[in-house]
């Protein structure tokens, strides 16, 4: 019993000197399979909304933006007029840094 009394302060010191716990979720760039895995973890059984654009839809969107701006793809930037584009999960979490709260917005 006396041995436990001597070890207790040592165990308390070791517990205090231990590494700090890492935050559960750090805002970060999430792309490809990492983004999908994070959405599965955040949304769980609810699932998440994901409707990728086909290559044709993406090309049509670029052509429409060029026609609005009157320039070429490699030329000047198109004007800010026109319909606003809704940002998707890839724009929000892969191109920019994404938070846990932002990921939850894509859950069903």
From Swiss-Prot:
Keywords: Carbohydrate metabolism, Cleavage on pair of basic residues, Disulfide bond, Glucose metabolism, Hormone, Secreted, Signal. Disulfide bonds join 31-94, 43-107, 93-98. Transmembrane segments: none annotated. SUPFAM superfamilies: Insulin-like (SSF56994). Residues 57-85 form a propeptide. One of its GO terms (biological process) is glucose homeostasis. The keyword Disulfide bond applies. GO terms for molecular function: hormone activity. Residues 1-24 form the signal peptide. GO terms for cellular component: extracellular space. It is found in: Secreted. Pfam families: Insulin. Belongs to the insulin family. Insulin decreases blood glucose concentration. It increases cell permeability to monosaccharides, amino acids and fatty acids. It accelerates glycolysis, the pentose phosphate cycle, and glycogen synthesis in liver. Heterodimer of a B chain and an A chain linked by two disulfide bonds. This is Insulin. The gene is INS.
């Amino acid at each position: 019993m006396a041995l436990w009394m001597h070890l207790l302060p040592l165990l308390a010191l070791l517990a205090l000197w231990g590494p700090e716990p890492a935050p559960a979720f750090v805002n970060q760039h999430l792309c490809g399979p990492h983004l999908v895995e994070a959405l599965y973890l955040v949304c769980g059984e609810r699932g998440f909304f994901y409707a990728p654009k086909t290559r044709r839809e993406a090309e049509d969107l670029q052509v429409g933006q060029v026609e609005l701006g009157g320039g070429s793809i490699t030329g000047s930037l198109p004007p800010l007029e026109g319909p606003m584009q809704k940002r998707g999960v890839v724009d929000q979490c892969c191109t920019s840094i994404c938070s846990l709260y932002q990921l939850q917005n894509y859950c069903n």
